[in-house]
């Protein structure tokens, strides 16, 4: 087995382990953030400051009975959470997480694969995760799960169109789909960040990412007040945990991509080294998603579709046209 294959396998194992741990810890942080906004304490009993709540929840999920409802399609019911996990982690393959560094005289590139269509790969593989809620709802033999899967089809496919069109304008400026090249394009300094050249694209992509991540206010797939837990209604134990671990892993992936594409990535930020700079940016966008969840109300399906097709899609197309005109001029 070649050194390249061994290195890649080690990177994959580290990526899965790190983001699985981060996903679990993010649940604790989110509960604390929501508690602060709602003037509650949040997790505070298990361990100091409730830090061991994540471990307690993990033990609970691993030891709960795995129930498959009567009349459900067992194969598809089991495959759905696996698809969610696989799509979330595979989509991270073209993301350069940190600058290259040297370890024991060997240069380490913190990226699985620097493919020249990295941004497109990220969106395409992430979009494949749409099948997870759809199949989960169809296989559960539950009306609430079925409604959740129908909403997943409408919501995720609609916003996938918007997010794909939105990235075209920044890519026209950079001239590459590689996330490494996009990062290098902004290496000149603070004013080279694409958020200043493409502010509309950033806003549209941020909103579309919340919709694709099924984050509030776009949590139509599993809104408790309407459809219990949506496509997850019949899931329990480890399978239920896999869905939410995939959601948080995807949240971190989108935060990295937004930081790389619009905010200079892992380039040095003044006196702040690149590795620390991207951690600050990613942490901000993860916190922002939690802040939005605590602040904005849930939207209705018709409001969501109107915003997507009548507002965001025309704005994305207009931004492409304006960017093309400016480049030609």
Curated annotation (Swiss-Prot):
EC number annotated for this UniProt entry: 7.1.1.-
Compartments (UniProt record): Cell inner membrane
Protein name: NADH-quinone oxidoreductase subunit H
Membrane-protein topology: Multi-pass membrane protein
KW Translocase (keyword) present: yes
Transmembrane segments: 9-29, 42-62, 75-95, 117-137, 154-174, 188-208, 238-258, 269-291, 309-329
Keyword Flavoprotein assigned: no
Species this chain originates from: Helicobacter acinonychis (strain Sheeba)
Gene: nuoH
InterPro entries attached to this UniProt entry: NADH_UbQ_OxRdtase_su1/FPO (IPR001694), NADH_UbQ_OxRdtase_su1_CS (IPR018086)
Functional summary from the UniProt entry: NDH-1 shuttles electrons from NADH, via FMN and iron-sulfur (Fe-S) centers, to quinones in the respiratory chain. The immediate electron acceptor for the enzyme in this species is believed to be ubiquinone. Couples the redox reaction to proton translocation (for every two electrons transferred, four hydrogen ions are translocated across the cytoplasmic membrane), and thus conserves the redox energy in a proton gradient. This subunit may bind ubiquinone.
